């Protein structure tokens, strides 16, 4: 790679999504010059990072045709560039939420090793696999990847059993094992705990020095609020509407970066003040119909615990995940559920929503009543729960993203039975329920294009916002927010956090980044099976 003069070069280019004459350009102005050289480590920074990574991935049509060039291709080559783009949106796709926890029953599951190889598919019920390509696997590189990404002990684990952080590392290994010419990674640290962030960051910092890989240039995408790793050498600040604002060596642009970040925060505060001054729908207007609204402390303490775990233990094939867990949740309380990736947080939440095969356990007590097979109804339990999570996001996008608009997407939150129901319901709602949807859309700034924009056409941030509003709409007793704000822009996230401070129901939050964590009064920290901490937050 070092013999090439450049990796990627853009010269006086205009990018479009199609050849149609009326197709609008991705950015209104031409990109005069942008270049990545060997040994440079770039971060694409700001709200336009996703589009720009797509530009580098050759996903758009460039005018003139040779205005986007790749230095690792020969001038006369007809071979397309080998570019791997890794976007972390949810976990391994599954047909329904409970499949995430029924992985040991899935006839078409793969081990972590098979997933990283990405060569075959087949059933666990038979002894053979169907080869999907004839690509030769570089086993030296594979061994180096699993060692450096801490995947050695996970090679034989089923993919559906991996935590979000483990799955993130496996996806990274899968892409790099294809030995691409260029690796693009959007939000590499999103939703990860500090230990997982350190593992991936250290790996990316030294990747080009792993001898068996041969190395390839890596470009990452980060938001304004993200910490830029010290190993990044260059930055390209991209606005979603105007394209490149500035680019070059980080050491020469630090003051400009500080100014841009500061200006973005000031604009955010101004938007917030303007919004508050003009607001004709208050938070009280939105929450006054919640069953817990207006409840006094002396009334709440007389109620049974909404959730009680009385020495709960859960294991997979003899391996403990949760052990002897005692936890009580009072109605209306707000909890931050903490723990490293793989500590059992997702398992705990799946038990509460009855998506886990071991949910029917008398040591799980709902409103003072122990769960028992045949006595406790899955649909009754979920009628009281609202949820937003990476798993739900991935499944909603796949199953409903191309057919439901914003208003219809939010309205599906009214389905009593489960958060996993995406069937259209808007036209069947009564006028009162429709008005509630409309009020929520207006308050959260989603009303303008609510009928004309499909869910899949939204940015990741707006998709997250729609799913958050969807989780509120049926006034659930329990609101589960599993990484609900990872990937959300600062302004809507702050609005959501402000709203949650007034929300009268019980809230269970999983978040690894302090800025993405709404205010909570208590915390449960899972450390290892049988070891945990419960305490009060210091807000």
Swiss-Prot record:
State its location(s). Answer: Mitochondrion
What Pfam families does the database record attribute to this sequence?
ABC_tran (PF00005)
Could you tell me which Gene3D superfamilies the record lists for this protein?
A: P-loop containing nucleotide triphosphate hydrolases
Q: Which UniProt keywords apply?
A: ATP-binding, Mitochondrion, Nucleotide-binding, Repeat
Segments forming domain ABC transporter: 8-265, 307-537
Residues annotated as transmembrane: none
Say yes or no: keyword Ligase present. Answer: no
Chain sites annotated for binding ATP: 339-346
SUPFAM superfamilies to which the protein is assigned, alphabetical: P-loop containing nucleoside triphosphate hydrolases (SSF52540)
Q: What induces it?
A: Induced by transcription factor YRM1.
What is any one of the record's Gene Ontology cellular component terms?
mitochondrion
UniProt-recorded Gene Ontology molecular function terms: ATP binding; ATP hydrolysis activity
Q: Does the keyword Transmembrane apply?
A: no
Family designation: Belongs to the ABC transporter superfamily.
Q: What else is known?
A: Present with 1580 molecules/cell in log phase SD medium.
Name of this chain's protein? Uncharacterized ABC transporter ATP-binding protein YDR061W
Q: Which organism is it from?
A: Saccharomyces cerevisiae (strain ATCC 204508 / S288c) (Baker's yeast)
